[in-house]
A protein has these predicted regions:
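A short beta-strand-turn-helix
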Residues: 43-60, 90
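Short active-site neighborhood of thiol/selenol oxidoreductases, capturing the structured segment around
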Residues: 56-71, 96
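Active-site-proximal beta-strand/loop segments in catalytic clefts of secreted hydrolases
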Residues: 65-66, 99-102, 134-136, 146-147
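Typically the conserved alpha-helix immediately C-terminal to a functionally engaged Cys/Sec
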Residues: 72-91
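Non-catalytic, surface beta->alpha helical segment in thiol-disulfide oxidoreductase systems
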Residues: 79-81, 121-166
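Flexible coil segments in periplasmic/lumen-exposed cytochrome c-class electron-transfer proteins
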Residues: 164-178
Length: 178
């Protein structure tokens, strides 16, 4: 009878640990989602808001894939997205969202629930920052890996935003913009 009592105590302790770990995990996931939302740069929406706004306003989408440890991503936030000309072009043509390529926050992507990590993997993103331009229905228009200076980024935003990308190469178009 003594052995059975010990097994009951062990089972209760294990059950308690399972419940504790489960609660901790769900708390971490909701904290991660809140952090993702509160850490948005000025002018950026959440992933879902970006697609909703893009459809409603008939604008393109800019997804900025980043990681928390990426120095160039932080520099992009600090030096590029704060630039007035970048903000003007973004507001005119795009809805933008930041996507943490290592996060486990889930979104609907191509009709399926996927984490930000899975979305980044599906889009072939291996370096950060990487900028993905999309139509409101999720079709990729352009993929730009790496840091882009504000003056160049303003031109890229105008090139894609005006639809010039449909008929011209960027370098040829850029020469006509002086």
């Amino acid at each position: 009878m003594r052995i059975n009592k010990n097994w009951v105590i062990v089972a209760l302790i294990c059950a308690g640990l399972v419940v504790l770990v489960g609660r901790s995990s769900s708390t971490m996931k909701s904290a991660e989602a809140k952090e993702a939302e509160s850490g948005l740069a000025a002018g950026f929406s959440t992933y879902e808001q970006a697609f909703t706004k893009a459809k409603a306003d008939n604008k393109l989408i800019l997804l900025d894939f980043y990681t928390d440890w990426c120095g160039w991503c932080k520099r992009m936030d600090r030096d590029v997205y704060s630039d007035a000309s970048v903000q003007a072009e973004l507001g005119k043509y795009f809805t933008a969202a930041k996507v943490n390529a290592e996060a486990t926050v889930s979104h609907t992507y191509l009709g399926e629930q996927r984490t930000e990590q899975q979305i980044a993997r599906h889009l072939g993103i291996t370096g950060y920052p990487t900028l993905i331009f999309m139509t409101p229905d999720g079709q990729v228009v352009e993929k730009i890996p790496g840091y882009v200076q504000a003056s160049e980024f303003t031109m890229v935003l105008r090139f894609i935003g005006t639809g010039a990308y449909k008929t011209q190469e960027y370098q040829s178009w850029k020469k006509t913009q002086s």
